[in-house]
């Protein structure tokens, strides 16, 4: 049976995973996990037994989260007797799950806000089939965040292998890519920038996905040099809505089937409430939610657009609204002068 997870020097097979799930028939509704394997085991237990789960980041300040006290964390709850004979049974239970999973926004622009998702919304973008089997994923996201959950479900539902590279240094990441012959990487543009400079190319990587931040052609060119065999695409996702659409390069297209679920007001992308999770913190403009993402149309009729910045990233300089991301791009474009700049 294939490896499920490589975490540091530890290897966990899918057989070990199933045995661990069956062994202790309890879970933690609110859990700060000591390690990634324990986190995944608890997540899977909740999902396959239709139990609610609140995902807590290790550095989440609970004093900022109403209704949750420290004494409630890591307290086990008994589960109804169950037994899974193999991964087919586990995945069948997952795909029928009625669990509600609570995650929190990062809190970078204020207090963390909780958003409740069904398993259906969390796995909306998962693709299953023979072409997705036998893959090895670099796990580069925080596991309690939306992007981390989506990478997990994509890998898990195809019984792929996950290799933990979250918060690793550049040399460590390259060591994992080479040692495990990683085929798929999904990460923020910041993660890929931290891989620069590079000394060699890695031919095992078949697909590279970027998400969570603005990226640019200069970064795509460098990624292509590091991973010359990889297809590069960009994903638009949010804690509130999950994954919505992908792009090749920096140009997204809203699919025709859901184009009526979006609106743009003063360059800000608005998302229809039917695509969102549930949260008391959501405020709607009619039936639409203000994403805070500023875009520019490339072809409005066909639904093509580029992501410009977050609305709250704009700063006032001498009475003018300035986008730090555009300043960063301009500085990085000065050939031979600047190695890397972050604004």
Where do the protein language model's features map onto the residues?
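Conserved AMP-binding/adenylate-forming core of the ANL superfamily
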Residues: 1-26, 65, 78-81, 117-120
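Conserved pre-ATP/AMP-binding loop-to-beta segment of ANL
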Residues: 81-104, 131-137
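Conserved ATP/PPi-binding loop(s) of AMP-dependent carboxylate-activating enzymes
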Residues: 264-296, 302, 320-322
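AMP-binding/adenylate-forming catalytic core of the ANL superfamily
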Residues: 292-342
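Gly/Ser/Thr-rich phosphate-binding loop
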Residues: 196-252
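Conserved AMP-binding/adenylate-forming
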Residues: 20-60, 139-142, 321
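Conserved AMP-binding/adenylation subdomain of ANL enzymes
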Residues: 123-136, 144-184
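Conserved AMP-binding A3 loop
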Residues: 99-127
């Amino acid at each position: 049976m294939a490896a499920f997870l490589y975490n540091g020097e530890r290897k966990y097979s899918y057989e070990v995973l199933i045995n661990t799930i069956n062994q202790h028939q309890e879970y933690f509704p609110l859990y700060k996990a000591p390690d990634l394997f324990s986190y995944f085991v608890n997540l899977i237990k909740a999902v396959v037994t239709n139990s609610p789960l609140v995902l807590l980041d290790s550095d989440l300040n609970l004093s900022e989260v109403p209704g949750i006290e420290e004494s409630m964390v890591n307290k086990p709850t008994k589960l109804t007797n169950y037994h899974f004979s193999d991964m087919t049974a586990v995945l069948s239970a997952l795909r029928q799950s009625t669990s509600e999973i609570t995650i929190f926004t990062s809190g970078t622009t204020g207090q963390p806000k909780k958003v409740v998702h069904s398993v259906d919304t969390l796995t909306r973008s998962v693709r299953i089939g023979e072409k997705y089997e036998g893959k090895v994923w670099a796990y580069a996201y925080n596991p309690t965040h939306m992007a981390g959950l989506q990478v997990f479900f994509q890998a898990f539902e195809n019984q792929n292998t996950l290799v933990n590279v979250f918060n690793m240094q550049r040399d460590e990441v390259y060591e994992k890519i080479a040692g495990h012959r990683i085929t798929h990487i999904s990460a923020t543009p910041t993660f890929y920038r931290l891989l620069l400079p590079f000394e060699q190319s890695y031919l095992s990587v078949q697909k590279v996905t970027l998400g969570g931040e603005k990226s640019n052609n200069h970064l795509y060119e460098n990624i292509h040099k590091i991973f010359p065999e990889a297809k590069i695409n960009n994903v638009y996702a949010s804690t509130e809505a999950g994954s919505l659409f992908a792009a090749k390069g920096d140009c997204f297209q809203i699919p025709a089937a859901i184009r009526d679920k979006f609106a743009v007001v003063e360059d800000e992308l608005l998302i229809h409430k039917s695509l969102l999770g549930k949260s008391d913190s959501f405020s709607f403009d009619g039936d639409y939610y203000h994403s805070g993402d500023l875009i520019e149309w490339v072809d409005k009729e066909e639904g093509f657009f580029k992501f410009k910045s977050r609305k709250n990233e704009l700063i006032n300089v001498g009475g003018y609204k300035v986008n730090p991301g555009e300043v960063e791009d301009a500085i990085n474009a000065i050939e031979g002068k600047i190695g890397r700049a972050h604004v």
